From Swiss-Prot:
This is D-alanyl carrier protein. NCBIfam families: dltC (TIGR01688), PRK05087.1 (NF003464). The lineage of its organism: Bacteria, Bacillati, Bacillota, Bacilli, Lactobacillales. It is found in: Cytoplasm. 4'-phosphopantetheine is transferred from CoA to a specific serine of apo-DCP. SUPFAM superfamilies: ACP-like.
Amino acid sequence: MDVKAEVIEIIDELFMEDVSDMMDEDLFDAGVLDSMGTVELIVELENRFDIRVPVSEFGRDDWNTANKIVEGVTELRNA
């Protein structure tokens, strides 16, 4: 499974929300993510992709859409 498909699956599993049709929509504004959800998402991303997301790199504006999450995970996997 590619990064995009897996990120979509993780968001769906955690938040019961299919974001495949809203990849560029702000997930906070859409009510998908909140502060607790963000923590859950980071933990799951770290476990599934064997990455570490530094707090300094997880700004809301940098990871607020599914596409930005995919980009962030991809960058951390390639680091």
